From Swiss-Prot:
Modified residues (Phosphoserine): 101
The family this protein is said to belong to: Belongs to the phosphohexose mutase family.
Gene that encodes the chain: glmM
Gene Ontology CC: cytosol
Function: Catalyzes the conversion of glucosamine-6-phosphate to glucosamine-1-phosphate.
Gene Ontology molecular function: any one: phosphomannomutase activity
Transmembrane segments: none
CDD domains registered for this protein in UniProt: GlmM (cd05802)
Protein's recorded name: Phosphoglucosamine mutase
Length: 451
């Protein structure tokens, strides 16, 4: 991570940290870096979610892009994966999404996609950051016909919707409850599932600029759980603000998280011989029950650090076509280059339809172990060296011995704060509490900030 770019672009409180001035510079410098080797006039797609700050940042960003001679296609409100899809299929130089994903409305973010539809590589982000920090802006300033042009492109939404529908199957007879988080999916999910002939019920479909992710969406599925029960829906589907992740609800109202969704789709692909290298890419935070279910099914796994960018990196480097996170980021590389909540939802419904099984039946193959995570404030200089402290290493080894293979412990530093994260999984809540609390007490004693 750099000074400006985090794991998912540039983020901050809109008009305070992520200002129009910064958005203009990101457009100008980002557009230049991503198009400097183009032989024809570069084309860049720009989209946003429904936040009140979106149009302000969009205007500034587009002005920056136009100032370096780029032809900008303005998509309006569109899901993040829609930008990725259009960049690839319309052969654009780059794409930009203005969104802070599952964060509240006061935040916003700007993330770039290269001409291959993937998020930027670290070296490209560092090149943009170098221009941001340069004492003087020395980039070309074209005039007259050298300036960029702006094209309103509402057709982009229709093309993305049509693509989504082509990946699905006829859902006649199926009732689907949707929660579009008052976000980007609110302009597309209804139409897509109606085109697939599903009966639908929808909440979180009335964005006002301030209510994105507010008590709705993948991080707040409680209303969707109630809607599923009230309507007798076969499944519920909750997206986040930019629709790059999905959390599902089965017909009984129970949550089906990313681990279970990935397993269900992975097993289906594996049985059809369509799972590349018969392997699923997941992160260190995936539940132990997920790993045991994969082992039972004979599916291999590749494990990465937390973050969908690391999952995608492993998929690209090793040729895998399915990966994701417990949080609901699911990447199906046969169709798109980034997490896509609506695409994942369609594939999940397809598995249900083609197997004739309910979502609760499909999800029951993964027994989710109780999981507890505690964040402990420690000396920043020690967070990466905790395992070098004998008392900490010894207590972790002791707890793992007691688990005897029927549980899991993960101790890792925060990437951004002076915190050590202690996580455990075990068959019962009482066991999880015991393992985490025992380790946490030793960590606090040895390297905690309060000592």
């Amino acid at each position: 991570m750099g000074k400006y770019f985090g794991t998912d672009g540039v983020r901050g409180e809109a008009n305070v940290e992520l200002t129009p001035e910064l958005a203009f510079k990101l457009g100008r410098f980002g557009g230049y870096v991503l198009s400097q080797h183009e032989t024809e006039r570069p084309k860049v797609f720009v989209a946003r979610d429904t936040r009140i700050s979106g149009e302000m940042l969009e205007s500034a960003l587009i002005a920056g892009l136009l100032s370096v001679g780029i032809e900008v296609y303005k998509l309006g409100v569109l899901a993040t994966p829609g930008v990725s899809y259009l960049v690839r299929t319309e052969k654009a130089s780059a794409g930009v999404m203005i969104s802070a994903s599952h964060n509240p409305a006061l935040d916003n973010g700007i993330k770039f996609f290269g001409n291959d539809g993937f998020k930027l590589a670290d070296d490209q982000e560092l090149e943009i950051e170098a221009l941001l920090d340069a004492p003087e802006d020395t980039l070309p300033r074209p005039s007259a016909e050298g300036l960029g042009t702006l094209v309103d492109y509402p057709e982009g939404l229709r093309k993305y919707e049509k693509f989504l529908v082509t990946t699905g199957t006829d859902l006649s007879g199926m009732t689907v409850a949707l929660d579009t988080a008052n976000g980007a999916a609110s302009v597309s999910a209804r139409d897509v599932f109606l085109d697939l002939n599903a009966e639908i019920a929808v909440i979180g479909e009335k964005p006002n600029g301030l209510n994105i992710n507010d008590g709705v969406g993948s991080t707040h599925p409680e209303q969707l759980q109630e809607l599923v029960k009230e309507t007798g829906a076969d499944l519920g589907l909750a997206f986040d603000g930019d629709s790059d992740r999905l959390i599902a609800v089965d017909e009984t109202g129970e949550i089906v998280d990313g681990d279970r969704i990935i397993f269900i789709i992975g097993k289906y692909l594996s049985e059809k011989g369509l799972l590349a290298h018969n392997t699923i890419v997941t992160t260190v935070m995936s539940n132990l029950g997920f790993h045991k279910a994969l082992d039972k099914q004979g599916i291999n796994k590749a494990i990465t650090a937390v973050g969908d960018r690391y999952v995608v990196e492993e998929m690209r480097s090793s040729g895998y076509n399915l990966g994701g996170e417990q949080s609901g980021h699911v990447i199906i590389m046969d169709y798109n280059t980034t997490g896509d909540g609506q695409l994942t939802a369609i594939q999940l419904a397809k598995v249900m339809k083609e197997t004739g099984k309910s979502l609760s039946e499909l999800a029951a193959e993964v027994t989710i172990y109780p999981q507890k995570l505690v964040n402990i404030r420690v000396e920043n200089s020690m967070k990466d060296r905790a395992m070098e402290v004998p008392a900490i290493a010894n207590i972790i080894a002791k707890m793992e011995d007691e688990m005897a293979g029927n549980g899991r412990i993960l101790v890792r530093p925060s990437g951004t704060e002076p915190l050590l994260r202690v996580m455990a999984e075990a068959p019962t809540d009482a066991e999880v509490d015991y393992y985490v609390d025992t380790i946490a007490d030793v960590v606090r004693t040895e390297i905690g900030c309060d000592n």
